[in-house]
């Protein structure tokens, strides 16, 4: 029987890859950890946010609980990415993060269909939601989850 490695899913490693993919689509733009969390969530459940893509992570009735877990994963992943030099930090307006040159080089090596689709959706999600405040993103997410009964 083949044994799967479930530690790859919902892990710092997986979240780190998604953060780098997300940050790579908008060049040197800096985002807060909360913005990264919400944009990643929107990216994975894009259909629920009326973006013209299917949900990358399928249907999930526990999205609100997943969002809470995703926040802590985002912070752990950011720490790991910063220490490895894969993302840069700016502290002028609170802690904000952008992909580094090393991170861009790493992302260019990711050629899977998932990586390509994630980046396509990320560009659309960023265009639609990047100017929203953290509170506004939370309000939109809460509304969408309650509207969908999830």
Regions found by a protein language model. Give the residues of each.
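Accessory DNA-binding and partner-docking regions appended to nucleic-acid-acting proteins
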Residues: 67
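Eukaryotic partner-binding/assembly regions in large regulatory complexes
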Residues: 1-15, 73, 117-121, 143, ...
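Amphipathic alpha-helical interaction segments
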Residues: 46-50, 85-88, 110
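Generic structural signal for hydrophobic core residues of well-folded globular domains
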Residues: 23-26, 42-43, 81, 110, ...
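Accessory beta->alpha helical hairpin/"wing" motif in late/C-terminal subdomains of nucleic-acid enzymes
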Residues: 89-113
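Short, amphipathic alpha-helical interaction segments positioned at domain boundaries
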Residues: 104-144
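Short, amphipathic alpha-helical interface elements at domain boundaries
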Residues: 2-59, 63
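Basic amphipathic alpha-helical segments that dock to polyanions
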Residues: 75-84
């Amino acid at each position: 029987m083949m044994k799967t490695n479930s530690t790859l899913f919902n892990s710092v490693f997986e979240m780190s890859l998604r953060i780098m993919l997300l940050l790579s689509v908008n060049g040197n733009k800096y985002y807060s950890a909360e913005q990264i969390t919400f944009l990643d969530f929107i990216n994975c459940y894009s259909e629920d946010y009326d973006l013209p893509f299917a949900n990358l992570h399928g249907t999930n009735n526990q999205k609100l609980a997943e969002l809470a877990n995703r926040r802590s994963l985002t912070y752990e992943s950011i720490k790991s990415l910063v220490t490895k030099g894969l993302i840069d930090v700016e502290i002028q307006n609170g802690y904000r993060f952008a992909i580094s040159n090393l991170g861009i080089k790493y992302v260019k090596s990711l050629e899977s269909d998932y990586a390509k689709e994630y980046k396509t959706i990320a560009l659309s999600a960023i265009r639609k939601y990047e100017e929203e405040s953290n509170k506004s993103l939370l309000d939109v997410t809460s509304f969408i989850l309650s509207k969908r009964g999830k």
